[in-house]
Amino acid sequence: MSIQHTIWKVGVQPVSLSTAKLASEQALEDMIVREPGILSNEWMLIGRQEQTGFGGRIDLLAIAPDGSLVLIELKRNKTPREIVAQALDYAAWVENLTTERIAQIFQRYSNGGSLDQAFQKRFGAKLDEETLNESHQIVLVAAELDDATERIIKYLNDRDIAINVLFFQVFQHGADQLLSRVWMIDPGETQANVATTTKAKGEKEPWNGEYYVSFGTGQSRSWEDARKYGFISAGGGGWYTQTLKLLSPGDRVWVKDPGVGYLGVGRVVDPVVSVNQFTIRTAAGEKPALDVLSTASRLRERADDPDKAEHFVRVQWLDTVSEDKAVNEVGLFGNQNTVCQPTAPKWRHTVERLKQRFTRWGN
């Protein structure tokens, strides 16, 4: 059964608002283009009404911070299962988009804009052509689903096909209309599927059991703190923190600062927790991280926001180096996902090379 949601007017006698309908799918699309946060604050729209070459048009195309693409199909009424087949067909087109083709799509959408400049401005990082469109996800935006469609989507997502549904409902409030929306599946889980299936175009191989971790340093995050106190962390939104849930005690992680290079290898000790729950082992005993870390003042600013707060995974370091001695060579794997399970041959080469540089990796 599709997710149902209602808005109530608060008062001595609460009153539920009556439902309404949008005039057209075009109206919904126009709203999303004007305010992409209706879908996600962590994506950037790059295309609209693009011809697939398969006799159809995709409604919207977005890009995530790791360079993966998001195919978005809009349906204002009940969505039959045939729409899933259509979306999968469109996804086959998205999968084969080249860097040049994606840049052209964005140029049309932005009236001549530069994709790499827009990406840098939006996400604060350089767009890596090697990781652009390594993976993608499908999002259906619909008022409701029939039961068959819902079963199909759950089946696909459970098997690591990154597909989700954003249910929306329109309510009438006097002369105004209000839009409510809710995800069928936690979007972080879908992103975790994207990270799990990330692969280089073309050749791939079974995952080797070694985890890649992106640890971006800055005003809210210090490698020297992480190295000294034994942790990795991420924050700023569910897109960045959700993949930390892929890690379990005993997993081995190879940690890279994308702007610097590889900094260390360690084993996971505890599952992910928020900054308010994470403690630091000091000479004076166990203390809250917010009382110890050098970046604590910045971390406190978002500590009570469950979406934006920093999240931590405790790690036992096996071997580390300072930032000025980071391992950064041509041909080593890199990715913007906080955690992923790469299946590219480059990852096998990277781990083999790193084992030569971080010699205590097996301790």
Where are these regions (language model features)?
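Short, Lys/Arg- and Gly-enriched loop/turn segments at beta-strand edges
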Residues: 260-267
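Loop/turn positions that initiate beta-strands
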Residues: 249-253
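Residues at beta-strand starts and edge strands
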Residues: 56, 68, 262, 309-311
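Aromatic- and Lys/Arg-enriched surface recognition patch
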Residues: 267-345
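A short beta-strand micro-motif
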Residues: 213-216, 254, 315
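Short, Lys/Arg-enriched phosphate-binding patches
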Residues: 246, 262, 275-276
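Charged, terminal alpha-helix-loop-beta segments
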Residues: 1-231, 238-248, 321, 330-348, ...
